[in-house]
Amino acid sequence: MTIHIYNTLTRQKEEFVPLEENKVKMYVCGPTVYNYIHIGNARPPMVFDTVRRYLEYKGYDVQYVSNFTDVDDKLIKAANELGEDVPTIADRFVEAYFEDVTALGCKHATVHPRVTENMDIIIEFIQELVNKGYAYESEGDVYFKTKEFEGYGKLSHQPIADLRHGARIEVGEKKQDPLDFALWKAAKEGEIFWESPWGQGRPGWHIECSAMARKYLGDTIDIHAGGQDLAFPHHENEIAQSEALTGKTFARYWMHNGYININNEKMSKSLGNFILVHDIIKQYDPQLIRFFMLSVHYRHPINFSEELLQSTNNGLERIKTAYGNLKHRMESSTDLTDHNEKWLVEIEKFQTAFEEAMNDDFNTANAITELYNVANYANQYLLEEHTSKVVIEAYVKQLETLFDILGLELTQEELLDEEIEELIQKRIEARKNRDFALSDQIRDDLKGRNIILEDTAQGTRWKRG
């Protein structure tokens, strides 16, 4: 089965064929570290960490690079407001970023380059563009000359005339064309700066990723990814800079994830409806946040609400409970061989369906449907009077493998005594109402979490297994 990726550049799904056999070069635009990340910022790390995990599962050696922009207008503004220097603020929020995304199940990239640690290669990149006639200096600033790059607009699929019509020259800018963008910005009084051939200053945003991608991954990379909002102008400008310099294709597959809405309204800081990751992971299990995010195809928008989160939690707990029940049954299962084939064939079908979903542009939504199917069939198998260790182990291994691909864990938080008593009372009410299906479900769910019930004449007793 081959992997197909929706390529923003061509607007169609294409078979994934890396430049080098069994190796993938992948660059994901990272955050500007001037504040804590919100859940919209967290979607790309979770999505593309999952892409990376699946590629590794399929046997690829993935070189995964994700940068930190640690000098920028927003950082300078934050430094001025807080009375701190830029490096101090950047260091603080790099650490906070790692805490947040690690909690959300994301592995560290192969390399996390920082702009301030790569200033020499950024300046060198700009100088080469100037030498080739693709950039020009203007009163200490350096701009990219967009009219010199023939393919400008090919990622956003907009004619250059339309792009120019919507562009403007800001006050203080000395550029030749409204579409030209800054590669180097002359330092203003009191700002952090670096020495360069054009005087003291700092790099523009777009050039940073081009230079660092080239340093760590080479002239051409396999996958370049980020949020949908980065397609234009950031990624468009990256293509222009990189391909103008090297004359080679910069990235072969462009992937962009969709936006996040809060209660059906687009999330934005201006509306004040954003949710910080470090706040929400105190309220909800970070694994639930990740599972929720992956329950929607990465290119589609997500509507984030507490009601939807709770509904998703019910589904996640159902899978975890099935896993717990399987583990609990392991000890009492035997070496039966009768009827194993029927169940093992079904398990293989689920594996195939899961991989087909992931091969289809990393469709985690459909892949998660297969997790529910595995859990449902496992529960059916557990109703058998006698169960086989071979089948139980196959179900357990499958759930563990599929969860690992999605960056998820199967552990459940231990129930508090009062939570157990509450569930027992709910079960008693269900039995009074002759709702035996609910009664059995509660009993089985508790058993899956190592809580054993014993019905006696004096009432229901329980113990931890």
UniProtKB/Swiss-Prot annotation:
It is found in: Cytoplasm. A motif ('HIGH' region) lies at residues 31-41. GO terms for cellular component: cytosol. InterPro entries: Cys-tRNA-ligase (IPR015803), Cys-tRNA-synt_Ia_DALR (IPR015273), Cys-tRNA/MSH_ligase (IPR024909), Rossmann-like_a/b/a_fold (IPR014729), tRNA-synt_1_cat_dom (IPR032678), tRNAsynth_Ia_anticodon-bd (IPR009080). This is Cysteine--tRNA ligase. Keywords: Aminoacyl-tRNA synthetase, ATP-binding, Cytoplasm, Ligase, Metal-binding, Nucleotide-binding, Phosphoprotein, Protein biosynthesis, Zinc. Its EC number is 6.1.1.16. The modification Phosphoserine is found at S270. Zn(2+) binds at C29, C209, H234, E238. ATP binds at K269. It is an enzyme of class 6 (ligase). Belongs to the class-I aminoacyl-tRNA synthetase family. PANTHER family: CYSTEINE--TRNA LIGASE, CYTOPLASMIC, CYSTEINYL-TRNA SYNTHETASE. The gene is cysS. One of its GO terms (biological process) is cysteinyl-tRNA aminoacylation. GO terms for molecular function: ATP binding; cysteine-tRNA ligase activity; zinc ion binding. HAMAP family: Cys_tRNA_synth.
